[in-house]
Structures are given as C-alpha cells and as structure tokens.
Amino acid sequence: KLDRTGADFDFDVQSIIDRLEAKPAVLHIPIGSEADFVGVIDLVEMKSHTWSKDDGSEWDISDIPEDMLDEANSKRQELLDVVAEADDDVLEKYFADEELTVEDIKKAIRKGTLEGMFVPVLAGSAFKNKGVQLLLDAVVDYLPSPLDIEDVTGFKPGDEENELSRSHSDEDPFSALAFKVVSDPHVGKLTYFRVYSGTLNKGDKVTNTTTGKEERLGRILRMHSNSREDIDFICAGDIVAGVGLKNAKTGDTLSDSCLLYTS
C-alpha cells in the first residue's frame, strides 16, 4: 500500500524484524512513495518496473535510474547476504566471489522460503495494481506447490488417538476446510473453502465434522474478484465458494466422512 499517505517501506521492513521477529529478504526497492509511488526496482533481476496508468494495466521494464543505482547495488548485496546461506551451492559461489545468476538467487530464495529461514518482502500497491504482477510471479517462483507440502493430518471426532492423514491427491477421500463465510445479496450464504484432497461434484453431499450433519452442495462458484463462475467439479488444491451449506462456519472441516483436521 505504498500509495497511501504515510507509507514508509523501510519502517515496514523494520517492523517485520521488531514485531514478528522474522528475517526479511527484501526483493524490491520502491520508486517514490505515497502519491508519487510509480514503481519498484527488482533486486533479483536488477530492473526497474514503472507503471504509467492508474489501473496498472501497462508498465515498463527498464534499466535502474542512475540516481538509484548505488542504493540498488547496496540493497542487492544485503539481499545476497541473507539468501545465499539457504543453498550450499549458491553459498560456495558467493564466498568465491563468483557472479550469482538470477537462477541461482531465485533458487536460494525459494529454498530459504520453504525452510522458513526468511520471509520475502515485496513492494507495491494493490489498489492501483502496481507490483501485483511481480507478486504473482513471486508466488510461483518462491512459495510451495502442493507437492512441497506434507500430508494434512486429523482424526475422527471422538477418536483422537487414531490419527488419519490425507495427501494432496484427487485419489484420496474428499476433505476441505471452510475459511470464510459471507452473506451474498444474490445467492445467500457463501462458504469459501479450500479442497485438501479428493474430488467433488455439484450436488454431492458433504459431512460437516463440527455438526456431524450432511449437507448438499447446491452450487460451486469460482470467484474472480467482483465476478463469479459456476463450475460442476472441483479437485485437490481448488479454492472455491459453495452455496447450500447452511450450517457451515469458519474453521469447519468438510468431508465425505467424519474427519476433523488438526494441521
């Protein structure tokens, strides 16, 4: 939210250290701030990204401005100091003063992120869609895919000693977690949920493990910001909204059998 009055990127980075006790890996430098925020410098690829339109639909990628080059070089060195330790091969090249490629740096950032060694920090403004494109790229480059995540574990209500697990696979029984419930003026109660395993068709019944009741999923909606799309089928990894789950609440487990998830 660097376009907001009072926005201070350096202060926010320091807050991550002071308040969250986390180690930031700063990937961007903002170009301008508040009303003058126009773009970011990508410290991984050492390029400047500037947005010319208010809706963020068009942007230019160019060399770093001369007046920011020294700062960018200094901040990139700080970034390399943080991320190089995440990968032995990268660390060896770093200590040997060999030039690290973009692929080397991205590899180290991803490995360190997955292992919880540090937290990537990016700059932007979602309201005007500045930097969001780079954020989406970072999600793909650095965050875990379903294959990187361990199986979800849980138990049958009333039998907590018998731990069960579900892999992130379409072949396992259906399981999902309701993480948001809202009232929609057009379709009524909407239950947002993330599918951890299995598949489900529109009209199928699911068991709410909190209430023990079965409910029929009348509609499945894929949400696109301010629009929605009706779909007939979902599988592991999907995040959707369901219509017809009258008793669902935030935090409920939805399953084709009574299974309550703990992690």
Question: Residue locations for each model-derived region?
Answer:
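Structural and coupling elements of P-loop NTPases
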Residues: 1-263
